[in-house]
Amino acid sequence: MSQLITKAALRVLLVCGRGNCNMFVSSVSSTSVMKSPYEITAPMRIHDWCGGFGDFKIGSKHVQGNFNLRWMGMSSASAMEKKDENLTVKKGQNGGGSVAVPSYWGIETAKMKITRKDGSDWPWNCFMPWETYQANLSIDLKKHHVPKNIADKVAYRIVKLLRIPTDIFFQRRYGCRAMMLETVAAVPGMVGGMLLHLKSIRKFEHSGGWIKALLEEAENERMHLMTMMELVKPKWYERLLVMLVQGIFFNSFFVCYVISPRLAHRVVGYLEEEAIHSYTEFLKDIDNGKIENVAAPAIAIDYWRLPKDATLKDVVTVIRADEAHHRDVNHFASDIRNQGKELREAAAPIGYH
């Protein structure tokens, strides 16, 4: 009687191990092939649960397990891993560099072959040749907006007050002053562009190009800073000061723009006027020999399309022209709001950068 029970139990286990497990493993393994090689452990576990172990005993009987299913799962997993490795190596060879992850998303990590006009390789990832430009050196540097109303006077006084600690701290160290100035000047365009972007999608209306114009301004000011970082190496306490000033100015300007965009743009207009003055003094010290007229950084030569023999004086000159353009744009934006109109009602000055 006990032998009959043992034989019946063995038949049930063998049927499960050879029948059901084949079905489970084949279906799950085919699904895992489509998903990921790392999910291939699932069918092996199912095979184990269904009785496809190695050698095992039931009572006094010794049963030889079936390894065909396990081997099939393991071989398919190793084949898939090998296939992915080949794909990775092949992409690395074709792309000119090692690829850490197979490009499942269709994103090519290898850099395109971009060259300068002279045929040399383009070295920058932060901007491309079609994003470079020549600054408008004929722009009027002496323009000044005379404060007319309370908002204008408040903006003018704010900027004059901000200049006092800057003059005390940096004095005539115009390289460090320019570095600090650009960390502040890169904030308003980003804040204004961000708030206009949110307003545009909130009210389902176009911005008249002002989002693009302000974000271009922020990026341009950031490139000024990246250029200055090639010339000036700030000390640790100056870096700490930058973090402090940026945090305070960003939040203050954000609140100001939410409350009164007219005032915010006027403040930026006056800040740019101060920037023009600072860079003019910078140029005077270069002409007087107080600051060495060193060779221009490579990033500046490519970004502003300067001649290969350009110097620091050329770099400061084009940066000053950029600041004059930002001055005009922000005073223009404030004038639009001063007339009770939205910025989108007047076309934004796009295309300078």
Curated annotation (Swiss-Prot):
Q: Which InterPro entries match?
A: AOX, AOX_sf
Q: Which residues bind Fe cation 1?
A: E182, E221, H224, E323
Gene Ontology CC annotations of this record:
chloroplast; mitochondrial inner membrane; mitochondrion
Tissue expression profile of the protein? Maximally expressed in dry seeds. Detected in roots, stems and leaves.
A biological process term (GO) from this entry: alternative respiration
User: Quick one: which residues bind Fe cation 2?
Assistant: E221, E272, E323, H326
Q: Where in the cell is it found?
A: Mitochondrion inner membrane
Q: What is its EC number?
A: 1.10.3.11
What cofactor does its activity depend on?
Answer: Fe cation
Membrane topology, as annotated: Multi-pass membrane protein
Transit peptide: which residues?
Answer: 1-21
What does the UniProt keyword field contain?
Disulfide bond, Electron transport, Iron, Membrane, Metal-binding, Mitochondrion, Mitochondrion inner membrane, Oxidoreductase, Respiratory chain, Transit peptide, Transmembrane, Transmembrane helix, Transport
Question: What Pfam families is this protein classified in?
Answer: AOX
Record's catalysed reaction(s): 2 a ubiquinol + O2 = 2 a ubiquinone + 2 H2O
Q: How is the cofactor bound?
A: Binds 2 iron ions per subunit.
Q: Membrane-spanning regions, if any?
A: 178-198, 240-260
An annotated Gene Ontology molecular function: superoxide-generating NADPH oxidase activity
- UniProt xrefs under Gene3D superfamilies: Alternative oxidase
Family according to the record? Belongs to the alternative oxidase family.
Complex formation: Homodimer; disulfide-linked.
Instruction: List the PANTHER family hit by this protein, alphabetically.
Output: ALTERNATIVE OXIDASE (PTHR31803), UBIQUINOL OXIDASE 2, MITOCHONDRIAL (PTHR31803:SF6)
User: What does the record give as the function of this protein?
Assistant: Catalyzes the cyanide-resistant oxidation of ubiquinol and the reduction of molecular oxygen to water, but does not translocate protons and consequently is not linked to oxidative phosphorylation. May increase respiration when the cytochrome respiratory pathway is restricted, or in response to low temperatures.
The protein depicted here goes by the name Ubiquinol oxidase 2, mitochondrial
**Record gene name:** AOX2
